[in-house]
Amino acid sequence: MAMRGFTLFSILVLSLCASSIRSEETETKEFVLTLDHTNFTDTINKHDFIVVEFYAPWCGHCKQLAPEYEKAASALSSNVPPVVLAKIDASEETNREFATQYEVQGFPTIKIFRNGGKAVQEYNGPREAEGIVTYLKKQSGPASAEIKSADDASEVVSDKKVVVVGIFPKLSGSEFDSFMAIAEKLRSELDFAHTSDAKLLPRGESSVTGPVVRLFKPFDEQFVDSKDFDGEALEKFVKESSIPLITVFDKDPNNHPYVIKFFESTNTKAMLFINFTGEGAESLKSKYREVATSNKGQGLSFLLGDAENSQGAFQYFGLEESQVPLIIIQTADDKKYLKTNVEVDQIESWVKDFKDGKIAPHKKSQPIPAENNEPVKVVVSDSLDDIVLNSGKNVLLEFYAPWCGHCQKLAPILDEVAVSYQSDSSVVIAKLDATANDFPKDTFDVKGFPTIYFKSASGNVVVYEGDRTKEDFISFVDKNKDTVGEPKKEEETTEEVKDEL
């Protein structure tokens, strides 16, 4: 999934984070290490295994996580060997370089650092203390557990989770090394085990001696084997086989891990949203499964969403419940294709038309305001060309989110800047709600809010990296603006800035 400031993935899974009430502060020992720019690198370098939470003091989910994280740190401090939990305020100016370095896209983000920081993995576990402890005990142990007995097998392989088991005639050699490398790489996502006796496993051919990889799963065909131990091929097999043919998004928490994997995939994503209890639901599901089956292995992943539980997706795509049943396809470059009020006999042909390039992209946009008389002009997707890109004017454009605290603080400052340019018709100060409007990602790289760009009258587009004061904005605009009609300046390039994650 392409990295964006607040992605559909973020919107869908925020509600899955465990909630808790912050306990009153006491003077008891704190087990979570506090890091900053002065000790972050040294601390990471000296630990073989350390977990770091990137947080912001104003973040509600960070506040909910804090007491659970502290409880887990206390429990894990007595583990053998101890597991160290740490935190860093990544919103602090002097610490932001670490958020950028480790691609932190939102708060809280938890990373697992191994071997002095040489290997870094996402934390994909629970957000409550007991779950954190269980997950990290496993993560700090071997990447793959050896199955030596039937009891070992029953403990590792269950009917409720995906487990990847390598079967080898001997626990050495290139195939075994390749398997262990993938286990280490994907250990935060999946459970891995290995054995030299296939008879101990609950499903599949018991006479095989290997080398073979058998992936057990609680859906579709229950297990699948592969004998390709090429690194890339093995990783692809594991990732693709560990996701259902159709990922279901509903209230069932057992489906949530697969929803996360679905949106993390780089595949083109087809999503059908229906009322699960509505008339014709079973016919729609049946036809959708037929289409998914016929497109298996062609770079197209399928999700079936219950409209009642998909408000986050509807908000992200700008959809209405009146459009259900609907199917929307999102490509890797974030283009979207929409078919509303779809009927059973239209699903297959519409997907084929999409693959054949016959469907026009869908663009999410708020309505163009009937009146736009405030000093800071409102821009939506449908007016972006007229007000900004093709306006022939110098435009300072803020990309914001309604929930963003820094954006709210910036609003009156931009109002003052706009008022100061009211007598200069060549300058426009504008804003665009980036959560409700599509915009060209190749022109505007928005990974946090607020992000501010300046488009000169001659067409140069640069990101604003200065301080957020009236005087600094005015100085920047005056320095970079063109006199309307003057020759186009040579394009400048600037490094990407991420103000708020």
Swiss-Prot record:
Question: Which compartments does it reside in?
Answer: Endoplasmic reticulum lumen; Vacuole
Q: Which Gene3D superfamilies match?
A: Glutaredoxin (3.40.30.10)
For biological process, the GO terms are: embryo development ending in seed dormancy; regulation of programmed cell death; response to endoplasmic reticulum stress; response to zinc ion; seed development
Q: Catalysed reaction(s)?
A: Catalyzes the rearrangement of -S-S- bonds in proteins
**Coiled-coil stretches, from where to where?**
none
User: Which GO CC terms are listed, alphabetically?
Assistant: endoplasmic reticulum; endoplasmic reticulum lumen; lytic vacuole within protein storage vacuole; nucleus; plant-type vacuole; protein storage vacuole; secretory vesicle; thylakoid
Expressing tissues: Highly expressed in flowers, stems and immature seeds, and at lower levels in leaves and siliques (at protein level).
Site annotation (Contributes to redox potential value) points to G60, H61, G405, H406
**Enzymatic class:** isomerase
Q: Which cysteines in this chain are paired by disulphide bridges?
A: C59-C62, C404-C407
From the UniProt annotation, give the residues forming the signal peptide.
Answer: 1-23
Active site per UniProt: C59 (nucleophile), C62 (nucleophile), C404 (nucleophile), C407 (nucleophile)
User: Which PANTHER family does the record match to this protein?
Assistant: PROTEIN DISULFIDE ISOMERASE, PROTEIN DISULFIDE-ISOMERASE A3
Q: Spell out the subunit comment.
A: Interacts with RD21A, At3g19390, At5g43060.
Family the entry assigns? Belongs to the protein disulfide isomerase family.
Entry protein name: Protein disulfide isomerase-like 1-1
Q: From which organism does this entry originate?
A: Arabidopsis thaliana
Q: Which gene encodes it?
A: PDIL1-1
